[in-house]
Curated annotation (Swiss-Prot):
Organism: Schizosaccharomyces pombe (strain 972 / ATCC 24843) (Fission yeast)
Protein name: DNA polymerase gamma
General remark: In eukaryotes there are five DNA polymerases: alpha, beta, gamma, delta, and epsilon which are responsible for different reactions of DNA synthesis.
Catalyzed reactions: DNA(n) + a 2'-deoxyribonucleoside 5'-triphosphate = DNA(n+1) + diphosphate
MF-aspect GO terms: 3'-5' exonuclease activity; DNA binding; DNA-directed DNA polymerase activity
Signal peptide: none
Gene: mip1
EC number: 2.7.7.7
Biological process annotations from GO: mitochondrial DNA replication
EC category name: transferase
Amino acid sequence: MFYKACPSTLTCSKWIHSIIKTKKFLYCRHYSSKSFIDNAPLRINPVGVQYLSPALQNQVFPQQNTQISQLHLDLAKFHLAKHQLLNKETIKLPSFNFRLPPLQGKTISEHFYNIGLEFAEPHLSKAIKFSKIDTPVQPKTWKRQPGWTKYAKDGSISCVPYPDSDCMVFDVEVLYKVSPFAVVATAVSEDAWYCWLSPWLLGKSENDRQLIPSNPKGALFVGHNVSFDRQRIREEYNIKSSRNVFLDTMSLHVATHGMCSRQKPTWFKARKAYIRSQSTETSEDDDSSSFDDDYQNYLKQEPWLAHSSVNSLKDVAKFHCNITLDKSKRDDFASLEKEPILQKLNELITYCAHDTYSTHQVFKKVFPQFLEVCPHPATFSAMLSLGSVFLPVNHSWTRYINGVEEQYQQMIQLVDQKLSQYAEKAKDLINTKDTVLKDPWLRQLDWTPCNLYRKLKKATQEVPVVPKWYKKAYCKTEKRAVITAKSRLAPILLRLKWKKHPLAWSDTYGWVFSVERTSKDEIEMLLDQGLVPCSREEDTKLDYNNYIFFKVPHKDGPEARCGSPLSKSYQRYFEEGILQSDYEVAKKALEMSASCSYWSSARDRIRSQMVVWDKDAELGVPSSVDGFGIILPCIIPMGTVTRRAVENTWLTASNSKKNRLGSELKAMIRAPDGYTFVGADVDSEELWIVALMGDSQFRLHGATALGMMTLEGKKSEGTDLHSKTAAILGVSRDSAKVFNYGRLYGAGLKHTTLLLMQMNPTLKTAEAKELAKKLYASTKGVKSKMSKRLQEMGLPKLTFWSQGTESFVFNKLEAMAQLPSPRTPVLDAGITQALSSKNLSKNSFMTSRVNWAIQSSAVDYLHLLLVSMNHLIKKYYLEARLSLTVHDEVRYLSSDKDKYRVAFALQVANLWTRAFFCQRLGINELPQSVAFFSSVDIDHVLRKDVKMDCVTPSNKVPIPPGEELTIESVLEKLEQSGQSLEPLEQIQCFVDVKATTSAEITEEDKKNIAYLKAQAFY
């Protein structure tokens, strides 16, 4: 029960006694000298979760409270006691008392609607209007002059410095093999067409690094994958935000009609069937009807196919508008010279303009649908914010790329040279047949003698005779066999063994290892461990008479083939002695593979990043010795069905690792002098969201086992989720996280069993299955059927999870996913048509829909954070702008003078966002433990953790640490500097004297309690 704090207090030395006369209760609290902490009694709920202090509660939930029935409370206590989570000591946090920025409405819900609309306008109104207009007729001929040319509705043509419209569709074309900078751009507004031509293209400048000018007053740019077009606009390259905003039709399509990754293979097969059916319509081919039947069968089995398409403009225009785009002209822009472009210039401008027109037609169709699917203004507002991200760099960027590439080439050459030496040595055995046949590695190779090269007529020297395998690897220019660590020859030349058994290549199974048939005990043990034996029927080339062959295990499971035992995922097997070699260079090859894996996969994307330097444009920063540049990430604000942002370099960049070449990538993003990065990671974001969904059924935080473990679990006592899972499985706490998040996203028993066996190769299949079953019974629970009594009460006849720590959560998630039109509980965002149950067969893509419920809610969280920061930056004139977001992480670039105010703004944004989640799920309370970020980072580089030194094989010099500030530390900094958003002062506040329980029970409550009881104790 909660009671109000009395304003009259008696102070004595370091102790303060608060007398609550209403209940004759004496509170004895240690006095704090900090002005932002008071002596109010802690507000701890009936199951032991501390709520917001009275001062914060009254500001975030003004005159609001939440009551639960005694039956709900009793059930929650029984459930927690069953899982040994009741009556644990509460983690006690200070009673904070400071003035928050005022809510922009009577409730936190009103507040978010209003601040979402604040940033959305006037752009939202412009976009709505623009989606209803028709554009002028497209010009047939285009003037050949540099810069912008305006083609007005009345037929007049004029040279303009930039388009003067405040809303337009925009598209650019580049000679991508020559330069990332644009050569042609077209735009269309309600009143005019515009065309921009590069001065370099027309021979008016020697510099191909030409940026496109836009209106300094700002405009709304609509485009398909519009971030690509944004990268070519001059005004976007400045330390200060431009007044432009960008609306991406690709994101609008994905959010309304996008498909998940599991659906795409089916979509491509269906399209192939459709194309075949169309191509035979006019023919008299007997097969034409069967092709059409194929396509109709696809539609019958997968109705969602008629409601979705992949994301390219060509496919989206066809799907929404039945516009057939001819993209063959795109090949002309692959030219290495500008002359071919000039010869077809009018034709190519028309091609670009037709894409622009088609984008507007798509926009007219999809934008109204988007507003129905995502009706909250905060979603629209956040989407615009994501379109404004930017990354500052200096010349350390160039040094990084050059240095890593040089080291990468050196490491590759070191291993390749050794492999070449082994090949040279092995080829000399061509005349020693017995030696080759006795060698389990060399006998796999093709030893057919052949001439190394053709003999010239006048040549006197004999042509060397070599084995056929050597000839295939021979390079004439280098005059030696060139063999890389990725080659199939490498494991053979390195004499690799799996558990002391030679490796062999199978075209069917990939890399396998041979065990002599006489080793029956070992064969039985390998079968118990789940290793897959090879079948003679599948691959007849292996020697099954003397050996049993097993597939080399793969991290993706028994179905996957090992393509290279020298890839980074096999390094741990080498260190554990499972994978062996006679040669030291094998270890080097594996180390190189692990070290270079990041750079080899990302180098093309990293090296092709478009950097605009201070010599190219006025970037708003004083010149410095180390220079200054800006990268605009090519981000799709809503690139997945869960509305997550997508970008292929910065949103997928790994954190720096000591053995990973080039992994210091993010730390190459550096704030210029006078600026700093301020950011934070949301603590256990998705875990808290699903726990809240479970707790909301009781209207009490910590009512479910998962909720209690998330809010009050202690690592030291083993009561947090990861420690509990680690204890069940006998794995480390870090390993347990993989199992927990995998289960949350739909991983089943099969995947968990496989993961256990990967972590412990000695574990038998039966043992791993038993452990996995034990984990799922304890967490997700067991499948139960709805009893007749519950059905008579009006509950549907279905199965549900019961008795587990997470049963309440999974039942809630699955119930959400099975709704005809599921929506996120917070911002009311709907699922795409491709995953809507009305367009699916029964239970189809259930895992994807459950994932959608979780991840889409997490996207709502990010959007609310961004909208909150937009409001606070504007209201308090903070010198800050969004730099980058990565799912549960936000980073702002702030001036040094405002960095602590921005840090405080982030804490307020998090408090508001968590509170809004709670209110939307029916609880007008917020646990103190999650109200604020555990810390806000203030740093001069971009990195996951301010304490990371970012030392890697390519970066030997540690990067100095940044600051890591808790909410108390931030408040202390503001107090010391005399800065804050609102005056840093305590406020008088009261919390109503009300019990948390209510005797009122409705019939609906009885039904819900009966179902909750079944989930807990069935």
